[in-house]
Amino acid sequence: MKFFIDTADIDQIKAAHEMGLVDGVTTNPSLVAKTGRKFTDVLKDIVQLIDGPISAEVVATDAEGMIAEARELIQYHPTNIVIKIPMTGEGLKATRVLAKDGVRVNMTLIFSPLQALLAAKAGAAYVSPFVGRLDDVGHDGMEGVDEILTIFENYGFDTEIIVASVRSPQHVLRAGLQGAHICTIPYNVIMQLTKHPLTDVGIERFLADWKASQQ
């Protein structure tokens, strides 16, 4: 399973990259706003650091505007930039046009398997089901991922699933067990993945034994 990091914070991206845990990056307008920096400056920094898919989201709500923004964004790195487009009727129109031109689209804000199916039919390279937000309203977000995987396998879609809105290591574990292609994970959850209480106990014991043996 590939790990993407879900952030626009360049320091977090660097830290995760140094651990070998960044196969790609996903951003959105909210994450960029948290940095207090211009979107274009953030994007330039990420492109220089990461050699992998980098999702940059459009803010237009009409297909024509989405396509125009997409054509500007891919200039930052024609190979690695992936255009993030929301799951709407206009988004499907834009995705169809961009996909025909060879532009990879990550269709975001997916909340149902049927939305994922429509995105795949439009030519999206990736779909991003938001599992945490579904959990928030009483649904099992990861169950939806399993259903999307089944549909894509049934019909031979090449579209990859990016498990998004990840809130805990449990989401990552279930994604791995289900066979999801990618998890995009916030930095704090990535750090949680590195930890286990027994690991800390083991380190303390090893250090204590070593110290005692050297006296």
Curated annotation (Swiss-Prot):
Keyword field contains Cytoplasm: yes
**S-S pairs:** none
Q: Which reaction does it catalyse?
A: D-sedoheptulose 7-phosphate + D-glyceraldehyde 3-phosphate = D-erythrose 4-phosphate + beta-D-fructose 6-phosphate
Q: Where is the active site?
A: K84
Gene Ontology CC annotation, any one: cytoplasm
Biological process (GO) annotations held by this record are:
carbohydrate metabolic process; pentose-phosphate shunt
Going by the UniProt record, its keywords in alphabetical order are: Cytoplasm, Pentose shunt, Schiff base, Transferase
Supply one GO molecular-function term.
aldehyde-lyase activity
Q: Where in the cell is it found?
A: Cytoplasm
Domain of life of the source:
Bacteria
Instruction: Report the CDD domains cross-referenced here.
Output: Transaldolase_FSA
Which ranges of the sequence are coiled-coil?
A: none
Q: Which PROSITE patterns match?
A: TRANSALDOLASE_1, TRANSALDOLASE_2
EC numbers, comma separated: 2.2.1.2
Pathway listed? Carbohydrate degradation; pentose phosphate pathway; D-glyceraldehyde 3-phosphate and beta-D-fructose 6-phosphate from D-ribose 5-phosphate and D-xylulose 5-phosphate (non-oxidative stage): step 2/3
Q: What does this protein do?
A: Transaldolase is important for the balance of metabolites in the pentose-phosphate pathway.
Annotated family = Belongs to the transaldolase family. Type 3B subfamily.
- This protein is called Probable transaldolase
Instruction: Give the source species.
Output: Syntrophotalea carbinolica (strain DSM 2380 / NBRC 103641 / GraBd1)
